[in-house]
């Protein structure tokens, strides 16, 4: 069987520059999604394009530790560190979900030095929509 010769300039071998452009972003939106199992922090510009994101799982927390307030604080710090370097000074915060990491993530955002124009709770609440699942019996 003949050996396959790797082509120079193929997509897998050559990578031209960094994928993320380092634009100057003065204002952005920080989305915090806090579930009982994990906390995901996404930073976007005002048009909704994702600049940076982090979660408790990507920060190295496994299992039930992902739902802790400390994990949420670490995830928020990681997501915001990159956008502060890109020059973000002001931000709006949208918090979604009932998780333990809500307050801890907000505390980490406040401590980062970004001025918050407002904090909004965007947790979806049904107007008596679908029937909820039956109660757990343990």
Swiss-Prot record:
Belongs to the universal ribosomal protein uS11 family. One of its GO terms (cellular component) is ribonucleoprotein complex. It comes from the Eukaryota. Residues 1-25 are annotated as: Disordered. It is found in: Plastid, Chloroplast. Gene3D superfamilies: Ribosomal protein S11. Keywords: Chloroplast, Plastid, Ribonucleoprotein, Ribosomal protein, RNA-binding, rRNA-binding. GO terms for biological process: translation. The lineage of its organism: Eukaryota, Viridiplantae, Streptophyta, Embryophyta, Tracheophyta. Pfam families: Ribosomal_S11. Part of the 30S ribosomal subunit. Its main location: plastid. NCBIfam families: PRK05309.1, uS11_bact. This is Small ribosomal subunit protein uS11c. GO terms for molecular function: rRNA binding; structural constituent of ribosome. Residues 9-25 have a biased composition (Basic residues).
């Amino acid at each position: 069987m003949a050996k396959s010769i790797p082509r120079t300039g193929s997509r897998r071998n050559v990578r031209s520059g960094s994928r993320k452009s380092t634009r100057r972003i003065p204002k952005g939106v920080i989305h915090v999604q806090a579930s009982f199992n994990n906390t995901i922090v996404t930073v976007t510009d005002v048009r909704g394009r994702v600049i940076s994101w982090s979660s408790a799982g990507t920060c190295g927390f496994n299992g039930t530790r992902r739902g802790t307030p400390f994990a949420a604080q670490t995830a928020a710090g990681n997501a915001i560190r990159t956008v502060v370097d890109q020059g973000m000074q002001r931000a709006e915060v949208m918090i979604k979900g009932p998780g333990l990491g809500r307050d801890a993530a907000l505390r980490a955002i406040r401590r980062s030095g970004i001025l918050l124009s407002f904090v909004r709770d965007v947790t979806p609440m049904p107007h008596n929509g679908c029937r909820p699942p039956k109660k757990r019996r343990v």
